[in-house]
Amino acid sequence: MTNRLETKYENLSSIFRLKGHDYQKQFFHLYAHRLAEMTRLLTPLAQKKWGNKEPIKKLCELRGEQDVHCILIGTIFKHQAHKPSILRDISEENQLAPQPPRQNYSDPEDKIVLEDELQRVRLQGKLNGQLLATGVVCAALGGTDSDGFFNVEDILFYESGPQKPLAPIKRSRLLVLASGLDQLQAHKFVEALNLFQYWLAGSLGNNKEAGSMVRLIVAGNSVRASAMAHVPTLQVARTQANANDTVQAVSQLDQWFASWARSLPVDIMPGPYDPANFMLPQQPFHKCMFPQAAQLATFQAVTNPYSCRLDEALVVGTSGQNVSDLLRSTSLDSALEALRCTLTWGHVAPTAPDTLACYPYIESDPFILRECPHVYYAGNCESFATELHEGSEGKRTRLVCVPSFSKTQSVAVVDLDTLDCRMVNFSVDAE
């Protein structure tokens, strides 16, 4: 039996647990709270960067004025001609030309607008609109012109909140990050899953390394990792077969989770294709789905996004929806770059609720990064990628794009003391 290191654990995801289910509210409240809180956080940062001589003005104060040099704080909105529209759904009915489907709807002609509680102004100047997203709150330094534009000279983002320092290194504590188990297709890589299980238990490779593993987080798409094929209504038999396959996949997952949880604590997040609520934040799986694993104190189903503290290290992550949505609406090159941007912007899911579905909160925006994480990850990425991001005031964050296990047979391992990160591959074909 492998002796395991123990860590102090704290679940910080209560802000993502829904206390009600009122979906009739408007999203205005969410945007309003986001802007109000981010304005409060950005104001001292803007004054520190640009000095107190630059006034911070509301957009309504610029009405009719020219050559006003100031700081504006507001929410970015992108006018995108290729953004998905309800018109596509009704085009056939009204005999309109349908919009062509696009994997990415960013375009050099996108128009960037900054809006606050009352007004909006078109931005131009020193900003790359293709790398910005609707919903991002920023401070912009610049001036107005005779055409009604605000010419941006510099731009400032929140860069997430303060960061608590890590204690001096004692001994490596390893956090294992996995995603995309796709149990419906597990017959294609069951050997890799077995090797993964042996590795977690300390029966494969370095037993000392296994003893250093303090937690496993599975970041979504455990049941399936792709959209279910469309089934015509009349094909009831096929629909029932799909349901039976899902039940069997969940049962098999229960056995895997129970086995892993006997070796170390396991946290399971729902993903975009799992049998869970679609909107962010996704709520934890019900324990009845995994009756064997649920009997173990080391197993728990958690939210997506998920936040926890392991000793001093703050760990925050998602099952990847925030990153994939950003890649559709911007010209960002990679999942790692998109993940880095959300950290810089200080917001886990800035495109929610515009193009990323989320609950219509009316009292707060839970997706704001009020404290800078030490480990920040996104699940279900096409491949493994990582970077140690160094922010202002000495903040250091390990960014991790967790690879889909079904596609790569790989997981990510983060040392919580050094913030080093590496990939471990369990493919039987791996060298």
UniProtKB/Swiss-Prot annotation:
Localization of this protein: Nucleus; Nucleus, Nucleoplasm
| GO BP terms | DNA strand elongation involved in DNA replication; mitotic DNA-templated DNA replication
Q: Which GO terms describe its cellular component?
A: delta DNA polymerase complex; nucleoplasm; nucleus; zeta DNA polymerase complex
What does the tissue specificity note say?
Expressed in ovaries and embryos (at the protein level).
> Source organism's superkingdom?
Eukaryota
**Intrachain S-S bonds:** none
Primary localization class, coarse: nucleus
Is Transmembrane one of the keywords UniProt gives this record? Answer: no
The entry's keywords: DNA replication, Nucleus
A single Pfam family, by name? DNA_pol_E_B
Q: Which Gene3D superfamilies match?
A: 2.40.50.430, 3.60.21.50
Q: Which GO terms describe its molecular function?
A: DNA binding
Cited CDD domains: MPP_PolD2_C (cd07387)
Q: Record keywords: Nucleus included? A: yes
The family note in this entry says:
Belongs to the DNA polymerase delta/II small subunit family.
This protein's assembly is summarised as: Component of both the DNA polymerase delta and DNA polymerase zeta complexes. The DNA polymerase delta complex consisting of three subunits: the catalytic subunit PolD1 and two accessory subunits PolD2/Pol31 and PolD3/Pol32. Within the delta complex, interacts with both PolD1 and PolD3, and is able to interact with PolD1 in the absence of PolD3. Component of the DNA polymerase zeta complex consisting of four subunits: the catalytic subunit PolZ1 and three accessory subunits PolZ2/Rev7, PolD2/Pol31 and PolD3/Pol32.
Q: Which PANTHER family match?
A: DNA POLYMERASE DELTA SUBUNIT 2
Q: What is the protein name for this chain? A: DNA polymerase delta subunit 2
Species this protein is from: Drosophila melanogaster
User: What gene, per UniProt, encodes this protein?
Assistant: PolD2
